A protein has these predicted regions:
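N-terminal capping/lid subdomain adjacent to the active-site entrance of alpha/beta enzymes
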Residues: 2-148
Length: 148
């Protein structure tokens, strides 16, 4: 892992991205994605991680921002991934901070993630899920065919 500076800072941002068309699932529809971004700066180098809070899991934008902000002092003191596991519960906030820490480590060392994570070789991407927006049968069939 990269050497830890005592001058790290954590910044939390909210971003909104439009979605092409309307994305519908059984719990509702949306035309934009609300994203929380965690940025960890160390000597001018910035690691970035993001997350999308889901009400289904008891998360909200405000709650996730508060969770991320609650570890700002620990990040400033050099918190790494291992300590993060006990500092935040599993969920969107921890994901954003964890990704920012990994991104920062890669940028500080100039190494790709697989080397920083001490893997033998890069891993191939794996599709773990694919969600189709609710629509007519014909449109859903066309979307499924286009994605396969």
């Amino acid at each position: 892992m990269a050497a830890v500076s005592a001058k790290r800072t954590l910044t939390v941002l909210r971003e909104t991205f439009p979605i092409q068309g309307t994305f519908r699932i059984s719990r509702g529809a949306k035309t934009e994605a609300h994203v929380v971004v965690a940025e960890i700066s160390d000597g001018g180098v910035v690691g970035r991680g993001e997350c999308v809070p889901y009400a289904r899991y008891g998360e909200s934008l405000d709650g996730v921002v508060e969770q991320i902000e609650s570890v700002a002092a620990a990040i400033g003191a050099g918190m790494e991934q291992e300590e993060l596991l006990s500092a935040l519960p599993p969920g969107a906030a921890r994901n954003a901070v964890d990704c920012a820490l990994w991104d920062l480590a890669c940028k500080l060392t100039g190494q790709p993630i697989w080397e920083v994570a001490d893997l033998d070789a890069p891993l191939e991407p794996v599709v773990t899920a694919y969600t189709l927006s609710l629509d007519t049968v014909e449109n859903m069939a066309a979307a499924a065919k286009a994605s396969s």
